[in-house]
Amino acid sequence: MNAPVKPSKLIKGATGDWEIVIGLEVHAQVSSKSKLFSGASTEFGGDPNAHVSLVDAAMPGMLPVINEECVKQAVRSGLGLNAQINLRSTFDRKNYFYPDLPQGYQISQFKSPIVGEGEVQVDVADGDGVTVGIERLHLEQDAGKLLHDQNPTMSLVDLNRSGVALMEIVSKPDIRSADQAKAYVTKLRTILRYLGTCDGDMEKGSLRADVNVSVRKPGAPLGTRCEIKNVNSIRFIGQAIDYEARRQIGILEDGGSIDQETRLFDAGKGETRSMRSKEEAHDYRYFPDPDLLPLQFDQAFVDALKAELPELPDAKKARFIADFGLSADDAGVLVSERESAEFYETVLSKLADAGRDGKLAANWVINELFGRLNKEGVAIEASPVSTAQLAAIVDLIGEATISGKIAKELFEIVWQEGGDPRATVEARGMRQVTDTGAIEKVVDDIVNANPDKVAQAQAKPALIGWFVGQVMKSSGGKANPQTVNDLLKSKLGL
C-alpha cells in the first residue's frame, strides 16, 4: 500500500486540490528472432511485407505454433519484476476488425496470463519514490501497420509487424504523478534491457504505453478513466498525463462528467483528443483459442531460467554503494543503463586497486566520460576513451603520479589522440611534483609576494584556496595538491 500523496503532487484547481490516478499498460516487443506463432523474421526495417508467413497473413488452414523462446523471455521478465509465474496459462482470441489484423482477431491471454502479480521499486529525482504493483504480464500478437502516405487514394497495409510477440505489462493504479509515471517506464525499460527480453527502443516501437488517467478529490472513490493509446516516448507520457489531468479537472469543475473513452496524444500540439468510446472486455468477445493448447511447464523450467538471470539494477546499485562507497545518486546513474554499468565494472576490473579507487573511477565515468559523451552525442559503446585507458588514468591519480588537473588534460589528449595514458604522461612530462623542497620554494615565493592576502587568509582561513590556486598555476598543475595544502597551512599559521 503506497503512502498518501504528498501535497506537492496534488493539482490545484478552482475548487481545491485534485489527485491524479495513473495506471499503465506497457507493450514491450519480445527480443526473439522469429514471431510468436510463426517462423517469420522479426527484423526491423525490411521492405513492406517482406517478413510475413502464411500464418501471419491468416491464410486458410494455417495453424499457430508457439515459439518457446518467447515463452522463456516472458518468464524471465516476470522473474525480473518479482512476479508470480503461472505454470499453466491459456491463449484467447480478442475479436475486433481492423485492416492491419488479417485474422479478424488477436491471439492474447485474457483469463489466464503467463505472469501474475509483481512489483517495481521506482525512485524519483525529488525523493518521491513509489512501489508500483504489477497486475499481470501476458503474451500477445502485435498487429500490422497501416501506411496512409504511400498512395493518395488508399491506405496500404504492411504485415511485417503482424504476429510479432509482445509482452503487455499491466500496472496497478499506484502512480500519482507524471514524474512517477516517467520514472516507472524508465525503470521498467531498464529491467527488460538488463534481462535481454526487450531492447526498449521506443523510436522503433519496441516499447510503447497505453496510459490510463483519472482524477479525484483526495480520499474520494476512483474517477472515470480515459486511456491514451500508444504513447511512444517517455517525455510524451509525462506531457499526455499533465494535459489529460488538467482537461478532466476542467470538465469536472465546470459541472460536467468524464466519458470513459480512448484518446490519442498529439505530440505536435501537446494535447490529447478523442478517438472512440472505451471498450470493455465483453466488447472483444474473448474466448479460448481452439487452435492452441494450454501453455504448461513445471517449476524446474522456471528455476533453470531464474538461475541464469543477470544481476538486476537494484541489486547492482546496492552492491556499488556497499563495495565502493558510492552515493545512491551516483550508483543510480551508473546502473540506469546496462551499457554504462558494464563500462564501469570493466574499468573496475582493470584498476590496480579497485577497493581504493572504485569511487574515484565512478566520478570519472559519470562526470568526465558521460559528460563528454553527452556533449559530443556519442554512445558509450563508441567511446574514444576505452575502459583500459580510463582505468589507467584513474590509477595514475590514485597512485599520485598525476594531479586531478593534469588528469583532465590527459583525458583530453586520450580522447583526441588515443594512446597509452602512462606513456603519454612520461613523454610529455606530466608527472606531478612531489618534491617538498621544490614545492616549498614556490609556496614561499607566492606567500612573500602577497602579504595583504596572507593577512586576509589568517583572518578568514577559507581564503587559503586562493594561494592553492596560485601555487598550482605556477607549477603548471603538477604540484601535489595535498603537499601544497599542508605547506600553506604551515606557512600561514592555520
UniProtKB/Swiss-Prot annotation:
**Family the entry assigns:** Belongs to the GatB/GatE family. GatB subfamily.
At the top level of its lineage, which domain of life is listed?
Bacteria
Q: Does the keyword Cell wall biogenesis/degradation apply?
A: no
Task: Kindly state which reaction or reactions the protein catalyses.
Answer: L-glutamyl-tRNA(Gln) + L-glutamine + ATP + H2O = L-glutaminyl-tRNA(Gln) + L-glutamate + ADP + phosphate + H(+); L-aspartyl-tRNA(Asn) + L-glutamine + ATP + H2O = L-asparaginyl-tRNA(Asn) + L-glutamate + ADP + phosphate + 2 H(+)
Q: Which gene encodes it?
A: gatB
Q: Which GO terms describe its biological process?
A: glutaminyl-tRNAGln biosynthesis via transamidation; translation
What keywords tag this UniProt record?
A: ATP-binding, Ligase, Nucleotide-binding, Protein biosynthesis
UniProt name for this protein: Aspartyl/glutamyl-tRNA(Asn/Gln) amidotransferase subunit B
What is the E.C. number? 6.3.5.-
State whether keyword Ligase applies: yes
Question: What function does the entry list?
Answer: Allows the formation of correctly charged Asn-tRNA(Asn) or Gln-tRNA(Gln) through the transamidation of misacylated Asp-tRNA(Asn) or Glu-tRNA(Gln) in organisms which lack either or both of asparaginyl-tRNA or glutaminyl-tRNA synthetases. The reaction takes place in the presence of glutamine and ATP through an activated phospho-Asp-tRNA(Asn) or phospho-Glu-tRNA(Gln).
**GO MF term list:** asparaginyl-tRNA synthase (glutamine-hydrolyzing) activity; ATP binding; glutaminyl-tRNA synthase (glutamine-hydrolyzing) activity
**Binding partners and assembly:** Heterotrimer of A, B and C subunits.
